[in-house]
Amino acid sequence: MQQRLHAGQLPSSIVVAVLRTFCRSSLIFVLAACSAEPAVDPDAPNRSGQQRAYDDSDCNLQTVLDPEKPGAPGHLIPSPRNPNGDSELAVLMRRMVEQLKENRLRVKGGEAIEKMWPAHRTMRCAWPTNPKERNEGYDGRAQSYLATVRAFDEAPSRETYEAVVEGCIACHQVNCGGVIGFIETLRWE
């Protein structure tokens, strides 16, 4: 399948999801600014329980990572898959895959999903296998991916699920490309 790329080589599905999220938040801001009502706390949950905005000050590119933390260089997590051990990010991504698979089944079955953003957001402050790959490019791709995760959490559907998978692929086209074939198996059908 040929994917059309836009906005700095991101798949169009990610660009659309990010724009939808941005446009919604901009509209809320404009409406709040024009309203005679008291300002809405952007961190307060809305009617669906979702956060209107989020504070990423505890987990972002500037977050200093603990060098003694399990998964840090020299403190890799024992793994039956990898005799050398796994980084914190590798272990997190395996959990992310399991959560994504489970949520695909839940959406197909008409059940409520488990919100993914609270766990997936930590990808921005987890030790990668190669610490040099935690950089502005990676962080930008992570933020784009997380926008698709938030869109899925807000409106779980085949379309928003596929946007999450596209987000995975977009990042892995730059870092750790060997898993793209596996990620393709996460598609809806």
Question: What is each of the regions a protein language model found here?
Answer:
Residues 2-5, 46, 168:
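A composition/secondary-structure signal for short, hydrophobic, low-basic-content segments
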Residues 3-26:
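Bacterial N-terminal signal peptides that target proteins for export
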Residues 27-28, 143:
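Short linear sequence elements within intrinsically disordered, low-complexity coil regions
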Residues 38-166, 180-189:
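Extracytoplasmic c-type cytochrome modules immediately beyond a signal peptide or single-pass transmembrane anchor
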Residues 164-176:
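The canonical Cys-X-X-Cys-His
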